[in-house]
Amino acid sequence: MAEKVAIFLFAGPEMPCRMIHTFIWALDIQRRDGEVKVILEGEAPRWLLVLPDPDHGRHGLYQKVKDAGLIDAVCKACAVQARAVEAAAEEGLRLVHDASGHVSLMPYIEAGFRIVTL
């Protein structure tokens, strides 16, 4: 049975290694025929203000993850705080607010996903 993993990234640009590992692991899980979803929570929506820039050093990694459809949701409350709502929309990413403005864990748990947080 293929693994199902939901990775909740909470770290913003002040902790780049967490974003890098989230994206590397997501691509690795997909490559190994697992199902993976990345969720941007906490400070992570701030990445949407810098990663879409082709001159950013990690733009290529971000673009691979985005093009693969692995970014499942962006927390709406956190995107509002980060002033990243427009950036999420421009990137075609889904803003979710089903748990008091944040992304609920329950749809992922009910679908059999393991939850990983960074």
Segment roles from a protein language model:
Residues 4, 34-37, 71:
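Residues at the starts of beta-strands that form the adenosine-phosphate
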Residues 6-20, 45-53:
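Short, glycine-rich nucleotide/cofactor-binding loops
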Residues 7, 38-40, 74:
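Structural beta-sheet core signal
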Residues 18-33:
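Histidine-anchored nucleotide/phosphate-binding helix
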Residues 33-50:
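Short, glycine-/small-residue-enriched flexible loop/hinge segments at domain edges that mediate gating
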Residues 54-84:
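A glycine-rich helix N-cap at a beta->alpha junction
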